[in-house]
Amino acid sequence: MPDYRSKTSTHGRNMAGARGLWRATGMKDEDFGKPIIAVVNSFTQFVPGHVHLKDLGQLVAAEIQAAGGVAKEFNTIAVDDGIAMGHDGMLYSLPSRDLIADSVEYMVNAHCADAMVCISNCDKITPGMLMAAMRLNIPVVFVSGGPMEAGKVKFRGDEKAIDLVDAMVVAADDSYTDEEVAEFERSACPTCGSCSGMFTANSMNCLTEALGLSLPGNGSIVATHANRKKLFLKAGQLIVELAKRYYEQNDASILPRSIATKAAFKNAMTLDIAMGGSTNTVLHLLAAANEAEVDFTMDDIDELSRRVPVLSKVAPAKQDVHMEDVHRAGGIMAILGELDRANLLDVSVPTVHEKTLKDALDKWDIIRTEDPDVYEFYRSSPGGVPTQVAFSQNRYYSTLDGDREKGVIRNAEHAFSKDGGLAVLYGNIALDGCIVKTAGVDESILKFTGSARVFESQDAAVEAILGNEIKAGDVVIIRYEGPRGGPGMQEMLYPTSYLKSKGLGKDCALVTDGRFSGGSSGLSIGHVSPEAAEGGAIGLVEDGDTIEIDIPNRTIHLNIDDATLAHRRTVQEAKGWHPKEERKRKVSKALKVYAMHTTSAAKGAVRVL
């Protein structure tokens, strides 16, 4: 039976000094011997998804204390990708994921904590904490701050639901007046919480449900609703139970690596494909699997993408649907329930809250349960009042959305598409693969052939798009923006948004070794591997080359002969793999260290030492 890790610093004559310091934090005689639970918070006033988390760590801590544990809170950093977008700040976003993972490891191991509650929300924070949980392999429960309510704007006689991406698109569309743009800006983000669509933050918080590491509703109930408080209270109670089961009953089945097995990772990816989640989730699941020492690869993702249908379309894939609508339809447990009925899940896997995923679905899937409390939970609605306060409203929808033929969540028979919401493409321009969010691609351009317009940076591409230099039929190539080449693998939300602004969303493709925001849609192909900076063929594309994209057949092809490609490679290798044009970009020592150790997107952009 394993000893409590904290016993290292709380027991024995020689630990008198350490105990003296513990006492200075408020511990008493009776606390030594209880499990010490790290409450890993990520409050910051920089990020709307985290601005309301300040007091929630202590809310969880009080439940831990009441359940017989000792709670000790600390904070990680949190980068807001939307605010960091469009300038050199975005270079720091993906590297912050690894910094978060390291900071959690440092704090938990330095102080010998026994278990963790991870309070996350936005883009790189949930993945960073997930990587740390897999690395540390101690009992953990994830609970996120929750989605923002969708914005509402009265525009030209109609009220419509909007989000951050809408504000970005109209800002670059000359058909909108300054006053109209300002109204979109003021209305797009009305409350605290992670941006309201199926963007990266919400995608990852949904995937923690499928991995079995968070409670039902974690990914879908809005941040402002009083019922979300129940998740935080339950997390505090549950983590003490899990810690005692492991350390006092030798039950290793509740450890993260016992729960997040390869089957669980495949379940999570299946969910991601079915709900058209962010392409960033591919990076993050690969990275978490790497930390868990699970053999989960791009090949697994490719295989799943060929047989999992799209059961839900949420903004940006369907602009009038947001996370609050997914919750009303039964949330993630409802999507998992439909996947189970289609025999696309392994429901024998355990979770932190039920013995198996099957048990969880029997209890929480609104189609199979008759529990009125579950129905009420999923009727939790937005409040419609701008606020930065968590749990500040208690409004309910009058009914649930249980329509599985035409509703927000469909069954497999009535799927939005029989082909999955994400796809892995291979070809001579991407030997190790690249990713496209097919749920956001118009059917008319699933097969696309166009002429390359090559840019050595995101900034140059944006300038060309806004300068009306991009025409219908172009394939915009943005390279040297990968994990190593950026460095930091910037998101390309501005280029994709501006293509929409210019009316080119269905007439152009964008191909990059960088990545995309979860808010991106259109024929946006990212994570091209190998990246240009490590000798990838994307670095050999020239203006005017023909690029052939065939999503149904999972191919992307640079249409030049092998001899020409080989000649270009010889010439480029002599020059070195770096941008042909100098970029106005300050690369700090921290970013240089990241670039030295990072791997390609095909491996999750993890570090190799």
UniProtKB/Swiss-Prot annotation:
This is Dihydroxy-acid dehydratase. The keyword Iron applies. Keywords: 2Fe-2S, Amino-acid biosynthesis, Branched-chain amino acid biosynthesis, Iron, Iron-sulfur, Lyase, Magnesium, Metal-binding. The keyword Magnesium applies. [2Fe-2S] cluster binds at residues 122, 195. Functions in the biosynthesis of branched-chain amino acids. Catalyzes the dehydration of (2R,3R)-2,3-dihydroxy-3-methylpentanoate (2,3-dihydroxy-3-methylvalerate) into 2-oxo-3-methylpentanoate (2-oxo-3-methylvalerate) and of (2R)-2,3-dihydroxy-3-methylbutanoate (2,3-dihydroxyisovalerate) into 2-oxo-3-methylbutanoate (2-oxoisovalerate), the penultimate precursor to L-isoleucine and L-valine, respectively. GO terms for biological process: isoleucine biosynthetic process; L-valine biosynthetic process. GO terms for cellular component: cytosol. Pathway: Amino-acid biosynthesis; L-isoleucine biosynthesis; L-isoleucine from 2-oxobutanoate: step 3/4; Amino-acid biosynthesis; L-valine biosynthesis; L-valine from pyruvate: step 3/4. Its EC number is 4.2.1.9. InterPro entries: Dihydro-acid_dehy_C, DihydroxyA_deHydtase, DiOHA_6PGluconate_deHydtase_CS, ILV_EDD_C, ILV_EDD_N, IlvD/EDD_N. It comes from the Bacteria. It comes from Acinetobacter baumannii (strain AYE). The gene is ilvD. NCBIfam families: ilvD, PRK12448.1. It catalyses: (2R)-2,3-dihydroxy-3-methylbutanoate = 3-methyl-2-oxobutanoate + H2O; (2R,3R)-2,3-dihydroxy-3-methylpentanoate = (S)-3-methyl-2-oxopentanoate + H2O. Pfam families: ILV_EDD_C, ILVD_EDD_N. Belongs to the IlvD/Edd family. Its cofactor is [2Fe-2S] cluster; Mg(2+). Binds 1 [2Fe-2S] cluster per subunit. This cluster acts as a Lewis acid cofactor. GO terms for molecular function: 2 iron, 2 sulfur cluster binding; dihydroxy-acid dehydratase activity; magnesium ion binding.
